[in-house]
Amino acid sequence: MAGINLNKKLWRIPQQGMVRGVCAGIANYFDVPVKLVRILVVLSIFFGLALFTLVAYIILSFALDPMPDNMAFGEQLPSSSELLDEVDRELAASETRLREMERYVTSDTFTLRSRFRQL
């Protein structure tokens, strides 16, 4: 159980759900089995939280967007560390290109070619 992943969005997953997909979306968000969430919902209904559970379920069923079909169940957005690693690689590649250009501009070859062009 990984807990809350701040990079995930809470969706309704009607493809995996029994009623509107709210329990499946919550299970995907918290990275727990769907059956566990469904059992907790049923237990909360039987142990005195029926009104709260039903109202929350109805509100979530209308408030949450359905998961797009192109996103697979369990698929997640890249984490912030992965995004930072990708940006770091791009910046390193840009720095390498900049150093190569700087080396060429400050070289004798560049000076010689620019003087030939001026003739």
From Swiss-Prot:
Q: Any transmembrane segments, and where?
A: 39-59
Family classification: Belongs to the phageshock PspC family.
* GO BP, one annotated term: positive regulation of macromolecule biosynthetic process
What protein is this chain from? Phage shock protein C
Q: How does it sit in the membrane?
A: Single-pass membrane protein
The coding gene here is: pspC
Q: What quaternary structure, including any partners, is listed in this protein's UniProt entry?
A: Interacts with PspA.
Q: Which UniProt keywords apply?
A: Activator, Cell inner membrane, Cell membrane, Membrane, Stress response, Transcription, Transcription regulation, Transmembrane, Transmembrane helix
Q: Is Transcription included in the keywords of this UniProt record?
A: yes
* Function per UniProt: The phage shock protein (psp) operon (pspABCDE) may play a significant role in the competition for survival under nutrient- or energy-limited conditions. PspC is involved in transcription regulation.
Q: Which domain of life is it from?
A: Bacteria
Show the GO cellular component annotation of the record: plasma membrane
Main subcellular localisation: membrane
Where located? Cell inner membrane
Expression triggers: By heat, ethanol, osmotic shock and infection by filamentous bacteriophages.
Q: Name one Pfam family in it.
A: PspC
Q: Does the keyword Cell inner membrane apply?
A: yes
